[in-house]
């Protein structure tokens, strides 16, 4: 669970997720673009994760939840299959800037063993490439800039940490040679 004050957590919770209303709810038609109407049972709308989660967890008098959450398109079966095939070729940032954080939040709500495995394998495979790019002195230029565009925020932090540590190690080695 991330910090309440974390900007990354706020941005992750603002990610839209598909929701299906299980009940007719008076006055919520504006979520669908109907300013004066009700939200009809069976209506599908994309809501921020925080709101969808609250509505899914809240229950009416007959103990039915107001909405059913569906996994977001960033974690659809098509994307998970692409990640299984070759995780290095998928532009995670285009899917969700906070892809892994979104995956972690969705896994808090859904029990998806396969998704856990795919996300874990994806991170491991991409981390090796990130480390390789970070240790290249020209990693942030040219080809490296294209590489950086596809990284989600966690991967960018990993890249910066690896790049800065490699740079610090080179500086340290240079200083040792001078002495």
Swiss-Prot record:
Keywords: DNA replication, Nucleus
Subcellular location: Nucleus
One of the protein's GO biological processes: mitotic DNA replication initiation
Record carries keyword Nucleus: yes
InterPro entries: GINS_A (IPR021151), GINS_bundle-like_dom_sf (IPR036224), GINS_Psf3 (IPR010492), GINS_Psf3_sf (IPR038437), PSF3_N (IPR055221)
This protein's GO CC annotations: chromatin; CMG complex; GINS complex; nuclear replication fork
Sequence intervals crossing the membrane: none
Gene3D superfamilies: 1.20.58.2050
Domain of life: Eukaryota
Keyword Glycosyltransferase carried by entry: no
Primary localization class, coarse: nucleus
Matches recorded under PANTHER family: DNA REPLICATION COMPLEX GINS PROTEIN PSF3 (PTHR22768:SF0)
Subunit structure: Component of the GINS complex which is a heterotetramer of SLD5, PSF1, PSF2 and PSF3.
Similarity annotation: Belongs to the GINS3/PSF3 family.
Known function: The GINS complex plays an essential role in the initiation of DNA replication.
Protein name: DNA replication complex GINS protein PSF3
Organism: Phaeosphaeria nodorum (strain SN15 / ATCC MYA-4574 / FGSC 10173)
Taxonomy of the source species: Eukaryota, Fungi, Dikarya, Ascomycota, Pezizomycotina
